[in-house]
Amino acid sequence: MRKTTSFYLKPLLVVMLAAGALSVQAAPIPDQATLQFRGSYGIPATMTFKRSGSQYTVSASINVPFYKIRFESGGTISGNQLNPSYYRDVRNGKVYASAQFSGSKATYGKAGETKTENVRGRVMDLFTLAWQLVFTDGQLPPNLMITNGKRLYPVRGISPAGTSQITFNGRKIDVNQFNVRRGDDTAQYGFAPALNGVPAIIRYNDGDKNYALTLKSVSINGQTVQP
C-alpha cells in the first residue's frame, strides 16, 4: 500500500477563475513538508517548510557543484496567512543578501549595503509565496512585494498559464501552471493536483541566473506522498 499523509484529506483541485487567480482547495498548514526537486542540468534542490506553534520557516537549498546556495525565511502564522519577518540568501555559508520586515518597514540589500523602505503590504520571497498560494486558495496577499534580498519587486497579479506534465517516479502527472508578475519579470509556478496540490514547478530569473526546479519527491509530516 502506498504511503500517504493525513495532512491533506483530498487532492487540491486547481482551477481557473474568471479573474485569472489561482484557486485551490485550501489545505491546513503542516508541521513539516519536504520537497525534493531536480534543477537545471540535474542539480538537486530541496525545499522544506516547518511549523512550530505560530512560527514557521521555509528553506530552499540548491547544490550547485562547488557552490552551495541556501535561501532561508521565516515569520509568524496567523490563520492561513504567512507573515514573514526575515529572508536570507546564503552562499557557501556566508550571507550574500538579506531582508528584514517590521510593520511598514523593509530593510534589505547585499551584505553591508542595506537600505530601508516603507511598504504597504507584506514582503515575501518566491519560495514562501509558493506555500502561501497553497494555504490561501491561491489568493495573493494585498499590496504584495517580492524580494530576493537585493531588491523589492511589486507583484502585479497572477494568471493561468495552461497545463503541462512532469515525470514523477516514472509516471506522467499533470501540473497546472500560473504566472506571477513581479516587476518587469515573471515567475512561474506549477501545482500538481495528483500530489495534493504542492508546488511541482518553480521557475524564475535572478539577474543573469535562471532557476528551473521540477518536483521529484514529496513528504508531509513524515509521510511520503504519491499520485
Residue map of PLM features:
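Bacterial N-terminal signal peptides that target proteins for export
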Residues: 2-13
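Beta-strand/loop-rich accessory regions of lumenal/periplasmic or secreted enzymes
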Residues: 129-137
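Acidic/charged, solvent-exposed loop-and-adjacent secondary-structure segments enriched in E/D, K/R, S/T
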Residues: 107-130
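Short alpha-helix boundary/capping motifs
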Residues: 1, 102-105, 111
